[in-house]
From Swiss-Prot:
The gene is MET2. Its EC number is 2.1.1.37. It is found in: Nucleus. This is DNA (cytosine-5)-methyltransferase 2. SMART domains: BAH. Residues 638-662 have a biased composition (Acidic residues). Coiled coil: none annotated. One of its GO terms (molecular function) is chromatin binding. Belongs to the class I-like SAM-binding methyltransferase superfamily. C5-methyltransferase family. Residues 1071-1505 form the SAM-dependent MTase C5-type domain.
Length: 1512
């Protein structure tokens, strides 16, 4: 019988089969001669559908119940076994090896072999057998599999029962050892025993059974004979050219090796065994003596297993201090042993490590792959060289060090290599290494192994383990100190080993002996005692860790170790707590561990955020309450759900899945309250105030159980679910019903923890909602103290409000300490369906008049949701819009079945950046008539349909027509349709071309089209309107006045349809704006173009971006400085230093500002609007260093940003960021941001917008947070205008709800999506690496987009691109010029470069990992003329996260100008610095069209407030 590779199916093999046809049997040699009973299953046996875990008694029944079509052809059944136990006839669990001594039986669950996912086919049995033999498979796969055979079938053992796990795990480790030895010897049969043991120890280092690499080596030695027998048995089916294990000297050496440690562990075993009498385990030996020997050996094995288990338990319960703490290396003390600071410089293109491996979040480190790394270097996030020594060798909590690396990665061939200066005579490692250059993610830990003359260093990231080869020449001096320290430790080991008793050598003796070493000794430090001691102490943790891992406990506890540990504690080294849980977690770390030692000044030097005391208190209190025992960086753990790509979602994510309801359900009937069973006296207290609309008397006060309940107060109602917190309701009015019941109508007051701000909310703050209900007064459980809070608004009242709030908090703390009831307050209305917190409608609440605004809203919503005829039955109401004959309307495209020349356009959903191909805009029609169905004409709810005539769009004719035509142009036709009213999606206007607005802005935010051509769909011809054709166009209205609803399904708040020309906006309507984190100015440009903003000040940290901002906004004062310094300077200038929390460094930098800079600083009261986007790199999944301390500090920039809002108190505040901002840090940053703005006193609205729906050709989701003062109107969200398929804009809310900011445009929008060809099709040809800044256009603009984006420019700037290296340029030229072409289209061949090197044309790393990474779609990809551009990133490259960056027809990366156009920047916009700087400025910018859309809505809010003031 043979076993296929790994865990594949097994099959029976006749004795006369030619075994040489198989490469190698993948089974053990042990127990081959147990009698096998072949079973022939009748062909007539039927497959029986099994339910989950049926219980059976007979094995043959279980085999039949778990049969499958795949297994019916197998001569011998193969099944999968889980939750199993091997036991003797008495039911006592037994190790697998005990099969040699007696009968062993099985119990567990049997499943079909190949159906891993369908567990419902499992059949449970209590006892099968007996077991005839066992086998080990998976040698060539590198993953051991255990097979157990009965007389009837073979079983693949997958998962043991929990009670059997410890016993089985030991045997499984033996199988692992066999496979690892097989792998190592197959790759290098001539390896030395030391190398073999080291290689196996490394590969098994993740095992939970063994405490160290030394323990693994001991285990492998102890199993030498077992391993030898398994591998020797493989020789019987090996081919001539394959490794012969029987005579392999290393394997024989392993078999015969004696381990004193094992003998010591087995000293309590009474039997002594003469090894010479032992026989191989693959033969049964007759006779009592042989049986005794076999029995004694198995008993020894079991005793050893038990002793290991006891040892593990003892270690875990009596952990020494050295195992609890890791002493941190002090950088200042070791600085003199390292070179002067220098920076890593990469000369070759490097690939992100994350592209090579499957991310392993919450994965045990033993499951990570092992690779080798050559020509490597280590550095921090500033690219400054850093020693591996500063990173702990154990997983520790509260680590403030971050190390990254680069090098050449290659497959681990299993052979060891010496990192010492002189090559070991036993080392067989080749000096030539093939692989690819990569940069690593954060390095989490590292370890050192040594044996004989060899030293091995291995490090771990979250992706893989890396065995280090030789470092790069640049980094070698940094690694030399680490190697020297290891040599010193080895020298000390040798000293101790030479002593008869290790206790003879004290710490002082060892130091003296080190002083006496010869200068040519590799462990030589100095001849001076003080120098030697200093070196040993400051680098002591490496030495201590090596001693900790040493298997000899006498050496581990020798006087030298205790003396060294004492010395290190005496100099007060910091201790890190060692973490026991080996799970992969991503945490924020300090990217600058050697910043204090550097002589090089860097602008990337971290600085703690400058804050006001209010913002500092809110964030500080939160973390002190919710994370008192959690290390600071644990706050920044990133859950798996947060690893989603911020920018580029999977192209196929939701292609065929219709989205669930995306809007928050508007619940106005809260959970039913539970009545009070107690008898209470309830009576009215006061006179009747009036009547309800039903004539019921209204009262202002009532006595309920002795407590006074008044209109405008708050009461507690208990809900049905006893586990829920009792609900609090605001009393709107009270009345007595017609059946004499005393009633209350109230609105739910929601606790902050039940809103989107969650645990960041103040426990005393309640939020009014529109959820209302009517209850009996007897249902009231009590009253609560509620203050409808109001504070005067403005920066001038800030200090006064702080004093009042401080006293209020002190009073609340005192009441809490004295056990008094909580006093609540309310100052905002929470509306989850509108995504925000709004000022209380104080004039409409607590009136006691019988009116409830929430009931009114509910009635209006119900009315709007109805589809019905108007009174005259000549018009239609649908989704709140009234349609009349002659109106121009939008129709969902899927209702138009006849589609002219464009039938059944297929979507390129499988192609990267082809998400929008095939998606259609709304069909524009004119309503001709409302057809009432005859059978329902007399009914009140008559059924009806609408008759429409269709307009065609250019894209309905052809792609060429769409490209060359105006996006607002329509073609009239005679095609008519009769459709249900549900097909209508809003109203629009169709005008004559001459009646179009003179100033047609980009992006389009108006629902206006023009028509001057007739389209005959029967012939496909376009022609001018016939003279007799009568088309009634839209009536032109005064665009400065309010207009009726213009095509939106639902409109609220400021969505009043106001049309305003930017150049006519009065000066007083433009807000004086401060742009923080301004970048090159994308946000400011869009807001200014909308006519709402006048950017007077900007703060930007990076000089090239600041220069670009100044070029494009010459009237603005631009501060190229740290915003923390600027805020400190402003607060100093205003005399508010006491309210400023900042670093000494910030204060020192403020002192260096000149008087001219200080005189131009903005002051509170001068800025009406603050906008900006705090650096997103820490939040973005696109950022390579997102776990580092600089990103952590950047994330804290949100505190400085919020502090600007607190100190200035502008009318409006706008925060934009990447989508991941909502979920980053488990949502806490998002929640605290909104909690801070609410505490300041703002109204707040939150949402996620897709820039692609506002007229750019790329997917780019942005989180937007609006804040408006209590006196202003919060802007509504701009309506998405372009078709774009990019799902995933929902924000999770409590109670399982989701908020979707705007409607999804996948199924229709007013206009089509902007394509790649629309965007860049007119730009001239350029070559790879083009660097000429100014060029001629050479052609006129063709598409509507090109005309708008080019404007009046006559000179093309920044049409420059990065240069591809020689290999990538060859690859680029080989990529076919067609949609969807990428690296997979490269021929599988080698190319010879100009330097003579031979390289693979297809990237090797992609080929090997494609199966697990969606084929790496898009890498080295060409853009599709009809698709969209990929997300604009700061550094386009073919192997990056966004790898589709090749021009559709030219052999190069897309240019700076092409990237700028993809973001919506006009060609007149200038960028500054190098090509890399310009890409960075564009990639970090807010798309101006999105900013324009936001600005238009802000302007509407300002006009609405103005109109309301005029009305009042």
């Amino acid at each position: 019988m043979e076993t296929k590779v790994g865990k594949q199916k097994k099959r029976s093999v006749d004795s006369n089969d030619d075994v040489s046809k198989e490469r190698r049997p993948k089974r053990a040699a042990a127990c081959r001669n147990f009698k096998e009973k072949p079973l022939r299953i009748s062909d007539k046996s039927e497959t029986v559908e099994a339910k989950k875990e049926q219980n059976v008694v007979e094995e043959i029944v279980a085999i039949q119940l778990t049969s499958s079509l795949e297994s019916n052809d197998d001569p011998r059944p193969n099944r999968r076994l889980t939750d199993f136990v091997l036991h003797n006839s008495d039911g006592v669990p037994q190790p697998v090896e005990m099969l040699e001594l007696g009968d062993i039986f099985l119990e567990g669950v049997v499943l079909p072999l190949g159906d891993d996912k369908n567990e419902e086919k499992g059949v449970r049995f209590q006892s099968f057998g007996r077991v005839e033999n066992w086998n080990i498979s998976g040698y060539e796969d590198g993953s051991p599999g255990i097979w157990i055979s009965t007389a009837l079938a073979d079983y693949d053992c997958r998962k043991p029962a929990s009670k059997y796990k410890k016993i089985y795990d030991y045997f499984f480790e033996k199988a692992c050892a066999c496979v690892e030895v097989f792998k190592s010897l197959s790759k290098n049969p001539d390896t030395s025993l030391d190398e073999l043991l080291a290689a196996v120890a490394r590969s098994m280092s993740g095992s939970k059974i063994f405490s160290s690499g030394g323990a693994i080596q001991e285990f492998v030695i102890s199993q030498g004979e077992f391993i030898y027998n398994q591998l020797a048995g493989l020789d019987e089916t090996a081919k001539n050219h394959e490794t012969c294990f029987v005579e392999n000297s290393v394997l024989v050496s392993l078999r015969d090796h004696e381990s004193s440690k094992i003998h010591k562990a087995l000293s309590n075993v009474a039997l002594r065994i003469d090894e010479s009498q032992l026989v191989k385990s693959d033969h049964l030996v007759d006779g009592a003596e042989a049986e005794d020997v076999r029995y004694a050996k198995l008993i020894q094995e079991e005793e050893y297993r038990i002793s290991m288990e006891r040892s593990r338990n003892k270690r875990s319960s009596t952990t020494s201090a050295s195992n609890k703490f890791y002493i941190k290396i002090n950088e200042h003390e070791i600085a003199n042993d390292y070179p002067l600071p220098s920076y890593y410089k990469n000369t070759k293109e490097e690939t992100d490590e994350l592209l090579l491996f499957e991310p392993g979040y919450e994965v045990d480190t033993r499951d990570l792959p092992c690779r080798t790394l050559h020509n490597w270097a280590l550095y921090n996030s500033d690219s400054r060289m850093i020693s591996l020594e500063v990173l702990p060798m154990r997983p520790c909590a509260e680590i403030d060090v971050t190390v990254f690396g680069s090098g050449v990665v290659a497959e681990d061939d299993g052979s060891g290599f010496c990192l010492d200066d002189s090559e070991s005579s036993t080392s067989t490692q080749s000096n030539v290494h093939d692989g690819m250059n990569i940069f690593l993610s954060q390095i989490k830990e590292w370890m050192i192994e040594f044996g004989a003359e060899m030293i091995f260093v291995t490090l771990r990231t979250d992706m893989a383990w890396y065995r280090l080869g030789k470092p790069s020449k640049q980094y070698a001096p940094w690694f030399e100190t680490v190697m020297k320290t290891v040599r010193v430790a080895i020298s000390i080991f040798n000293m101790l080993m030479r002593e008869s008793r290790v206790a003879k050598l004290s710490y002082a003796n060892v130091i003296k002996r080190l002083c006496g070493l010869e200068e040519n000794d590799k462990a030589y430090i100095s001849s001076k005692l003080l120098d030697v001691e200093r070196y040993v102490v400051v680098h002591g943790q490496i030495i201590l860790q090596l001693f900790e891992e040493y298997p000899d406990k006498d050496i581990k506890r020798c006087p030298f170790v205790t003396g060294l540990a004492s010395k290190m504690q005496d100099i007060h080294h910091t201790k890190w707590i060692i973490k026991r849980k080996k799970k992969i977690l991503q945490k924020g770390k300090n990217l600058n561990p050697r910043a204090g030692l550097a002589h090089v000044v860097t602008r990337m030097k971290p600085m703690q955020a400058t804050t006001t005391r209010l913002v500092n208190r809110i964030w500080g209190e939160f973390y002190s309450i919710y994370s008192p025992e959690v290390p600071s960086e644990a706050i920044h753990e990133v859950e798996e759900e947060e690893i989603e790509e911020d920018e580029e979602e999977d192209e196929n994510e939701e292609d065929d899945i219709e989205e669930e309801a995306v809007e928050v359900q508007k619940s106005h009937t809260p959970k039913k309250s539970r009545g009070n069973s107690e008898d209470m006296e309830i009576k009215w207290n006061g006179e009747i105030l009036g009547e309800t609309s039903d004539g019921e008397p209204l009262y202002g006060r009532a006595l309920v159980g002795g407590e006074t309940v008044a209109v405008g107060s708050a009461v507690i109602l208990e809900v049905d679910d006893p586990d829920e917190t009792p609900a609090i309701y605001f009393v709107e009015f009270m009345f007595e019903s017609s059946d004499q019941c005393k009633m209350l109508h109230g609105k739910l007051l929601q606790r902050g923890s039940e809103t989107v701000i969650g645990t960041a909310a103040n426990e005393r703050e309640l939020f009014l909602t529109n959820e209302c209900l009517t209850v009996h007064l007897k249902d009231i459980k009590g009253t609560v103290s509620l203050d409808i809070r109001s504070r005067p608004w403005g920066h001038q009242y800030r200090k006064e409000n702080l004093v009042v709030d401080k006293l209020d908090r002190a009073r609340a703390e005192e009441r809490k300490a004295n056990g008094l009831p909580t006093e609540y307050y309310c100052k905002s209305l929470y509306s989850p369906e509108r995504g925000g917190f709004f000022s209380l409608p104080r004039n409409d609440i607590g009136l006691g008049s019988g009116f409830c605004s929430s009931c009114k809203i509910k009635e209006e919503e119900e009315e709007r949701s109805k589809t019905k005829l108007n009174i005259s039955k000549t018009g239609v109401f649908s989704n709140g819009i009234e349609y009349y004959n002659g109106d121009f309307v939008y129709v969902l495209p899927n209702y138009i079945t006849k589609d002219g020349l464009k039938k059944g356009t297929s979507r390129r959903t499988t192609l990267k950046c082809g998400r929008n191909v095939g998606l259609k805009a709304f069909v524009v029609c004119q309503l001709l008539d409302v057809i009432v169905l005859e059978e329902s004409r007399k009914a009140s709810n008559a059924s009806f349909q609408v008759k429409l005539t269709r307009f065609y769009r250019p894209e309905d004719i052809s792609e060429e027509k769409a490209y060359a035509s105006d996006i607002q142009e329509l073609y009239y036709s005679h095609d008519t349709y009769i459709l249900p009213p549900e097909a209508l999606q809003g109203k629009c206007e169709v005008r004559k071309k001459n009646d179009m607005p003179l100033c047609r802005e980009y992006p389009i935010l108006d629902h206006i089209f023009f028509c001057e051509v007739f389209y005959d769909s029967s012939t496909g011809y376009l022609k001018q309107f016939p003279a007799n054709m009568k088309l009634k166009f839209s009536t032109i209205k005064d665009e400065t006045l309010l207009r009726e609803k213009k095509g939106k399904g639902v409109e609220t708040g400021t969505s009043s349809g106001i049309l305003m020309k930017p150049d006519e906006v009065p000066k007083e309507m433009r807000l004086a704006t401060l742009d923080i984190f301004a970048g090159c100015g994308g946000l400011s440009h869009g807001l200014e173009k909308a006519g709402v903003s006048n950017t007077k000040w900007a703060i930007e940290y990076e000089e090239p971006a600041g220069h670009a901002f100044k070029q494009n906004h010459p009237e603005a004062t631009v501060f190229v400085d740290n915003c923390n310094v600027i805020l400190r300077a402003i607060m100093e200038k205003c005399g508010d230093v006491d309210d400023c929390v900042s670093t000494v460094e910030a204060a020192e930098l403020v002192a260096k500002l000149d008087e001219n800079q200080k005189s131009t600083l903005p002051l509170p009261g001068q800025a009406d609007f603050i906008s900006g986007g705090p650096p997103c790199q820490g939040f973005s999944g696109m950022n390579r260093f997102s776990d580092g301390s600089w990103s952590k500090v950047q994330c804290e920039m949100i505190l400085a940003f919020l502090s600007f809002a607190d100190y200035f108190r502008p009318k409006y505040f706008l925060l934009e960021n990447v989508k991941k901002f909502v979920t980053y840090n488990k949502g806490r940053t998002f929640q605290l941001t909104m909690a801070s703005l609410l505490e300041i006193g703002y109204q707040v609205r939150f949402g996620i917008l897709e820039a692609g729906t506002y007229g750019v050709s790329q997917p780019r989701k942005r989180v937007i947070i609006w804040a408006a003062s209590p006196e202003e109107v919060l802007p509504e969200w701009p309506e998405p205008m372009h078709v774009f398929d990019n799902p995933g804009s929902k924000i999770s809310l409590p109670r399982g709800l989701h908020y979707d900011t705007v409607r999804n445009t996948k199924f229709g929008a007013p206009f089509r999506s902007i394509t790649v060809r629309d965007t860049i099709g007119d730009l001239p040809l350029v070559e790879n690496g083009e660097s000429k800044i100014n060029k001629e256009y050479r052609t006129t603009p063709v598409s509507w987009f090109q005309k708008k984006i080019r404007g009046n420019m006559s000179v093309l700037t920044d049409h420059i691109c990065k240069g591809l290296n020689e290999l990538n340029l060859i690859r680029c030229k080989k990529i076919p010029k067609r949609p969807g072409a990428d690296w997979r289209d490269l021929p599988d061949e080698n190319v010879t470069l100009s330097n003579g090197l031979v390289e693979k044309l297809r990237p090797l790393a992609l080929s090997k990992t494609a199966k697990n990474h969606n084929e790496w779609k898009g890498l080295y990809g060409r853009l599709d003329w009809q698709g969209n551009l990929p997300i604009s990133i700061t550094d386009p490259q073919p192997m990056g996260k966004v790898g589709m960056c090749f021009h559709p027809e030219q052999d190069r990366i897309i240019t700076v100008r092409e990237c700028a156009r993809s973001q919506g920047f006009p060609d007149s916009y200038e960028f500054s610095g190098t090509t890399k700087h310009k890409h960075r400025q564009i990639g970090n910018a807010v798309p101006p069209p999105l900013a324009f859309a936001l600005g238009r809505k802000l302007k509407e809010a300002l006009y609405l407030k103005s109109s309301l003031q005029h009305q009042s």
